Regions:
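Membrane-embedded helix-loop-helix hairpins and adjacent transmembrane boundary segments
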Residues: 1-422
Length: 422
């Protein structure tokens, strides 16, 4: 149930972001000559003191660190499961590789590798889906297996395979899971792509392509999860104790294939390359975005420290290393869930930036005081809800995904403060 509502929320969020935000943000940013999200906020609200730039840059660094940690964690799990290595050693080696090509190659290296890695990821997803279905003996057998579990295919109940219990998805739980879609309104790396669109006429085509692709990708991901249970039931992959362990499903499929000749082993290799590609592609993009926020938005724009091009690049490289060290510390636990780490970072960006972006584009009365207050309120609520509310009220009505309450609070604060300080 959680996978279905998350996938649906992301699909809807993608379409709405392209439909409502893309064109307005592209036109507005070109009109005020803004090239980054902190720059857009500062110029849109006439913040000459660059307070908005400073706050937004700090938020970008804070929430890109766990994003980067999730990539390191995934790489560590991959090599640990594949080669029987110690998780910490595997994670450190993976992090070192990413750090090296980010610091030496910079944005060109990340852009080129992202392009190649996206192709590998797509092929890997399709191979996993096809081979997984083939190993079970067709989709009929796949769904026959899962239908035996009460609530597994019921999106209002769900079934926890690890605990062996049927869940209950009420309206509030559904709404909070669908709230994943709200995160798109505040994702800096996605919004930057809107700002960089060259031909406005291609927006409609781009929206259609992006929306269709997300639906296909989310659909395949959900199907892989369903197939994964059947593979587990047939003894092809091990029995997983929890959601964190279940994240090794694709690795285990690849390891199983490697035992059956060169062709199967080659297919398994592509699958593993797809996992590595997805994690490295994510980690390098987040590292460079965070480093850019420090060297450009924070140091040079907010603190008014002028740097030569060489010193700016050096500072960015140092920032990559420092951010990576913090991310490595966060990723040190082999039992941590990649999905949970990503969900926290996603909520942070969605709640801190999403309401501000929407108000900046659609409500003329929004001012810099409202924007700053809303940004801080949304980001802070994510921490409070995640580590205080959900921890102390687990299993109650308050135990919902932190993005929903944080987004609502951030939006409310923007409106209230803007009206009080007009």
């Amino acid at each position: 149930a959680e996978a279905f509502w998350t996938a649906l929320g992301l699909s809807i969020g993608t379409y709405l972001n392209w439909f409502f935000v893309a064109k307005r943000l592209r036109v507005y940013s070109h009109r005020i000559d803004a090239f980054t999200i902190p720059d857009f906020f500062s110029r849109r609200f006439g913040d000459n003191k660059k307070i908005l730039t400073c706050v937004s840059a700090i938020i970008i660094v804070i929430f890109f660190i766990p994003y980067t940690a999730s990539g390191f964690c995934a790489c560590g799990k991959l090599f640990s499961a594949l080669f029987g290595m110690d998780y910490t050693t595997a994670m450190l080696i993976s992090a070192a590789v990413i750090i090296v090509y980010c610091t030496l190659g910079g944005f060109f290296a990340a852009s080129f590798t992202d392009f190649v890695q996206s192709i590998i990821m797509t092929v890997a997803l399709l191979i996993v889906l096809g081979l997984g279905e083939g190993l079970i003996g067709g989709f009929d057998k796949v769904f026959a297996n899962v239908s035996q579990l009460g609530g597994y295919l019921n999106v209002f109940e769900g079934y926890d395979v690890a605990k062996g219990v049927t869940g209950n998805y009420n309206a509030l739980t559904v709404a909070s899971t669908l709230a994943w879609g709200l995160g798109y309104f505040g994702m800096p790396h996605i919004l930057l792509r809107f700002m960089a669109i060259g031909d406005e006429k291609k927006l409609k085509l781009s929206r259609r392509v992006a929306s269709v692709w997300v639906v296909i990708a989310m659909g395949i991901a959900v199907l892989i999860g369903i197939i994964g249970f059947s593979l587990m039931k047939n003894g092809i992959v091990p029995q997983y104790a929890d959601n964190s362990a279940a994240e090794n499903i694709i690795v285990d499929i690849a390891k199983f294939l490697s035992k059956y000749g060169y062709v199967a082993a080659f297919a398994g290799g592509i699958i593993l390359a797809g996992i590595l590609a997805s994690t490295m592609s994510t980690a390098d993009s987040q590292l460079l975005a965070a480093a850019s926020s420090i060297s450009e938005n924070l140091v040079q724009e907010s603190f008014k420290i002028k740097l030569s091009p060489k010193k700016s690049i050096l500072l960015a490289r140092i920032s990559v290393v420092v951010i990576s060290l913090v991310a490595i510390f966060l990723a040190r636990n082999p039992e941590s869930s990649v999905f949970r780490i990503v969900s926290f970072a996603w909520a942070g960006f969605g709640a801190a930036f999403g309401p501000v972006v929407l108000c900046a584009l659609f409500w003329k009365r929004t001012n810099k005081y409202g924007a700053i207050s809303g940004m801080l309120a949304g980001g802070a609520t994510v921490f409070i809800w995640k580590f205080l509310v959900r921890t102390n009220f687990a299993g109650t009505v308050l135990d919902i995904y932190e993005l929903l309450p944080a987004f609502i609070i951030g939006l409310a604060v923007i409106i209230i403060v803007s009206l009080l300080t007009k």
